[in-house]
Swiss-Prot record:
This is Calcium-binding protein 8. PANTHER family: CALCIUM-BINDING PROTEIN 8, CALCIUM-BINDING PROTEIN 8-RELATED. Negatively regulates Golgi-to-plasma membrane trafficking by interacting with PI4KB and inhibiting its activity. May play a role in the physiology of neurons and is potentially important in memory and learning. Residues 78-113, 114-149 form the EF-hand domain. Residues 1-234 are cytoplasmic. The gene is CALN1. Brain specific. Interacts with PI4KB. This binding competes with FREQ/NCS1 binding in a calcium-dependent manner.
Length: 261
């Protein structure tokens, strides 16, 4: 994940151009590699069901007046569904709240090693009622307007991503083409190395939990289609989560900078 630059920090003098990682095709310079984490530290696989995951009345609830409220009112059901799934991935224990520990584990699984100060700032930004955890309403109130802005929609169109992965499933585009399409869509938030790492991690996670992946396809001949659907949905979820965490890091950096002025 492209990290927001902190005041007084610069790039290492010995930074050299890399070869793009194990999958090849990368154009980003190498960064310090995060240590390997045990399986439980990796992002868990959450299958995206065929039906909508969030059918509540969130859009009908009263929100604070202002432009943020207007932007939230313009969120489509599909966009809300994707944001809800990203929240579910961050909520590792499924209790309906994101804790500071869960947020830290999610960020580490994507290769970013947050300090306690950074985690505290992000949690303070998200935790509006001060109870030490983040529920979905808080998650949406803070991040929703950012995700549905003109810039956000360009990188967070789930239907477009879904179409890209469908083409990959049907072998209409190669892995290299897939990576470069995703890099073009997310280049303001993710590096090529990030994209390669997410694909590798999601493939490994899927292999470890393949028995838990269920889709609407049944029968022996649908095994390949089930596999393709699970990979595609898992990757969509991972990229949505990475995008949201990137937005959170930008917000945290803005708070840090404003506090030093």
């Amino acid at each position: 994940m492209r990290l927001p630059e902190q005041p007084g920090e610069g790039k290492p003098e010995n930074e050299k151009k890399g070869d793009g990682g194990a999958l090849g095709g990368g154009e980003e310079p190498p960064r310090s590699q995060a240590p390997d984490f045990p399986t439980w530290e990796k992002m868990p696989f959450h299958h995206v069901t065929a039906g909508l995951l969030y059918k509540g009345n969130y859009l009908n609830r009263s929100l604070s007046a202002g432009s943020d409220s207007e932007q939230l009112a313009n969120i489509s059901v599909e966009e809300l569904d994707e944001i809800r799934e990203a929240f579910r991935v961050l909520d590792r224990d499924g209790n309906g709240f994101i804790s500071k520990q869960e947020l830290g584990m999610a960020m580490r699984s994507l290769g970013y090693m947050p300090s306690e100060v950074e985690l505290a700032i992000i949690m303070q930004r998200l935790d509006m009622d001060g109870d030490g955890q983040v529920d979905f309403d808080e998650f949406m109130t803070i991040l929703g307007p950012k995700l549905v802005s003109s810039e956000g929609r360009d990188g967070f169109l789930g239907n477009t991503i879904d179409s890209i992965f469908w083409q990959f499933d049907m072998q209409r585009i190669t892995l290299e083409e897939l990576k470069h399409i995703l890099y073009h869509a997310f280049r303001d938030h993710l590096t090529m190395k990030d994209i390669e790492n997410i694909i590798i991690n999601e493939e490994e996670s899927l292999n470890e939990t393949s028995g838990n992946c269920q889709t609407e396809f049944e029968g022996v001949h649908s095994q390949k289609q089930n596999r393709q659907t699970c990979v595609r949905k898992s990757l969509i979820c991972a990229f949505a989560m990475a995008f949201i965490i990137s937005v959170m890091l930008i917000a945290a950096n803005q708070i840090l900078r404003s506090g030093m002025e």
